[in-house]
């Protein structure tokens, strides 16, 4: 699997030796979930009536090729199960897709999900795009009107209000986005992010204009710093503040322990404004999660 996946993701903005290390650890972790009962215990056993062992990941051999697969639920919704392919040593053809779906038939999934390079994949339905940049070439930043300040517990109420106001405005002004596909972190998550010093308040000329949430961690097999939320207050929109703030944070993180890692985040396909912002901030689409409808195996 490692050799195939190295060739599949060869154009990612990291050295081959780094990519190899990331993929080796990823495959090791995913294979351990074939026997890890603490992993299978996370799934809705009572609601589905399926035994715990059913939710262990499975390495399937199809026509001499291997596919490492596992059960998932889109957005945690029990009514939206899918099969995730987390490792493979061959392209996915119709025969493999059909046999994988048959193996997981009790899950009643309608889709198999794969992670492919770039943004376009003709056979798939996009789930999320991964926009990222390497810390090896940080952007220039000379915008003295913009500053970032790490939020404290005293800022909690303001952050809650800012998130609420910004999301409500987005739902009202961007037709493709709504509370059904774009939601902010909840209060408990926000509190956790503040305690971990992951919330940055954006100041323009010393006035609070929005916030960024950025945490160190993994995204699939990628490692680095992940932007998990970003909002600009309605009164401050239209001046590329989000992109400018992301460039500033990018620059600041470059001087921390960011070596051999990525500055990244996921964006849903309906969120065109965030894609444009990410590109202005120096990130490009390097990977995308794509759904393949299982019914196509019977075409």
Residue locations for each model-derived region?
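Conserved catalytic-core motifs of GNAT/GCN5-like acyltransferases
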Residues: 130-138, 282-298
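Conserved donor-binding loop and adjoining core beta-sheet/short helix segment
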Residues: 11-104, 209-230, 234, 289
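Catalytic core segments in nucleotide and nucleic-acid processing enzymes
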Residues: 228-231, 235, 248-253, 260, ...
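A conserved beta-strand-loop-helix scaffold within acyl/acetyltransferase catalytic domains
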Residues: 171-234
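Conserved acetyl-CoA-binding loop-helix of GNAT-fold acetyltransferases
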Residues: 92-102, 232, 238-254, 276-280
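Short amphipathic alpha-helix that is part of the acyltransferase structural core
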Residues: 1-37, 140-185
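Conserved beta-strand-loop-alpha-helix junction that forms the acyl-donor binding cleft
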Residues: 114-121, 263-275, 284, 291-293
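Acyl-donor-binding surface of acyltransferase catalytic domains
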Residues: 1, 5, 10, 35, ...
């Amino acid at each position: 699997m490692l050799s195939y996946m190295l060739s599949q993701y060869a154009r990612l903005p990291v050295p081959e030796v780094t990519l190899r290390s990331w993929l080796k650890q990823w495959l090791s972790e995913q294979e351990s979930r074939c026997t890890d009962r603490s992993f299978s215990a996370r799934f809705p056993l009572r609601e589905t009536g399926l035994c715990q062992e059913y939710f262990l990941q499975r390495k399937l051999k199809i026509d001499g090729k291997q596919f490492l697969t596992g059960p998932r639920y889109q957005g945690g919704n029990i009514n939206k199960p899918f099969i995730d392919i987390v490792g493979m040593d061959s392209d996915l053809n119709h025969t493999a897709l059909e046999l994988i779906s048959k193996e997981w038939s009790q899950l009643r999934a309608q889709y198999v999900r794969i992670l492919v390079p770039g943004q376009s994949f003709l056979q798939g339905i996009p789930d999320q795009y991964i926009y990222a940049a390497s810390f090896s070439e940080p952007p220039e930043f000379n915008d003295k009107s913009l500053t970032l300040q790490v939020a404290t517990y005293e800022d909690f109420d303001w952050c809650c209000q800012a998130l609420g106001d910004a999301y409500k405005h987005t739902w009202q002004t961007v037709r493709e986005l709504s509370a059904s596909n774009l939601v902010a972190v909840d209060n408990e998550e926000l509190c956790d992010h503040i305690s971990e010093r992951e919330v940055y308040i954006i100041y323009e000329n010393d006035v609070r204009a929005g916030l960024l949430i950025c945490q160190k961690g993994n995204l699939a097999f990628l490692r680095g710093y992940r932007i998990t939320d970003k909002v600009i207050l309605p009164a401050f929109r239209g001046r590329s503040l989000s992109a400018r703030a992301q460039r500033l944070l990018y620059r600041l993180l470059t001087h921390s322990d960011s070596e051999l890692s990525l500055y990244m985040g996921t964006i849903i396909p309906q969120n065109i404004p965030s894609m444009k912002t990410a590109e202005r901030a120096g990130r490009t689409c390097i990977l995308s999660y794509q759904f393949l409808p299982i019914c196509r195996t019977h075409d």
